[in-house]
C-alpha cells in the first residue's frame, strides 16, 4: 500500500540539466545521489511521479520517440538502484504556447493528482527552479527546492519574494529527511 505521492522535476533534480536541452540518451546523466534518493522513497512505500517541461520537442530538437528513450533510460537506472518511478508526464510546448501544462502552470501536477486519485495538499513537489516552485504552489502542493541544477539561483530569487519553503542540497538529502519525517 502506498504511503503517498512524491512528485519530482526531471532536469536539474534527477539528472544534470543543459542549457542546450537533453536531446539524446547519451546526454542524460543522473545527478550523484538522485537515483539512491528515488530508491529510498520507493523502499519507504511512496509512489514517485515525474512532471517535466520538455520544450525541446516544440523546438524540434528532439522527437517524442527520443524523449521516450531518454525516459526509458531513466526508469531503468532508477530500477537498477532499487527505485520505481510510476508515471512521467511532460509538457512538449514552447514557453510562448500559453498552455496550462507548462510549469509554472499547474496542469501537469493536476494531471498527476487525477492519475493517482489524490489531492495535492501536502504532497511534496520537488524542483530546482522558480517555475517548479510556482507550479507546486499553484497546484496546492508542498513546494520543495533542491540546490542542484538551477536550485542555488532559484533559492536566492525565492528568498527575495519572501517565499518560505524547505530547501535541500539534493534529492538524496530530501529523500532521507522526508522518509525520517514520515515514519
Describe the residue ranges of each PLM region.
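Short acidic, glycine/proline-rich loop/turn micro-motifs
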Residues: 18-22, 60-61, 156-158
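Substrate-recognition element of Asp-dependent hydrolases with the DxDx(T/V) motif
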Residues: 34, 38-71, 84-97, 136
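Asp-based, Mg2+/Mn2+-dependent phosphohydrolase catalytic module
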Residues: 2, 64-86, 94-125, 129-183
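Active-site loop signature of alpha/beta-hydrolase-fold enzymes
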Residues: 13-15, 57, 132, 151
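A short alpha-helix capping/helix-coil boundary motif
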Residues: 14-18, 53-55, 87-90, 110-113
Amino acid at each position: 500500500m502506498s504511503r503517498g505521492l512524491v512528485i519530482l522535476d526531471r532536469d536539474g533534480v534527477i539528472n544534470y540539466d543543459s542549457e542546450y536541452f537533453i536531446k539524446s540518451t547519451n546526454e542524460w546523466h543522473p545527478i550523484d545521489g538522485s537515483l539512491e534518493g528515488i530508491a529510498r522513497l520507493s523502499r519507504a512505500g511512496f509512489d514517485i511521479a515525474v512532471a517535466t517541461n520538455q520544450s525541446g520537442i516544440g523546438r524540434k530538437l528532439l522527437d517524442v520517440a527520443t524523449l521516450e528513450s531518454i525516459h526509458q533510460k531513466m526508469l531503468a537506472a532508477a530500477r537498477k538502484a532499487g527505485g520505481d518511478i510510476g508515471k512521467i508526464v511532460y509538457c512538449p510546448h514552447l514557453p510562448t504556447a500559453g498552455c496550462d501544462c507548462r510549469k509554472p502552470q499547474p496542469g501537469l501536477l493536476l494531471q498527476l493528482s487525477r492519475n493517482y486519485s489524490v489531492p495535492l495538499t501536502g504532497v511534496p513537489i520537488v524542483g530546482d527552479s522558480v517555475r517548479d516552485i510556482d507550479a507546486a504552489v499553484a497546484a496546492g502542493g508542498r513546494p520543495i527546492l533542491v540546490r542542484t541544477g538551477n536550485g542555488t539561483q532559484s533559492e536566492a530569487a525565492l528568498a527575495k519574494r519572501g517565499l518560505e519553503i524547505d530547501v535541500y542540497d539534493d534529492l538524496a538529502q530530501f529523500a532521507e529527511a522526508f522518509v525520517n519525517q514520515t515514519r
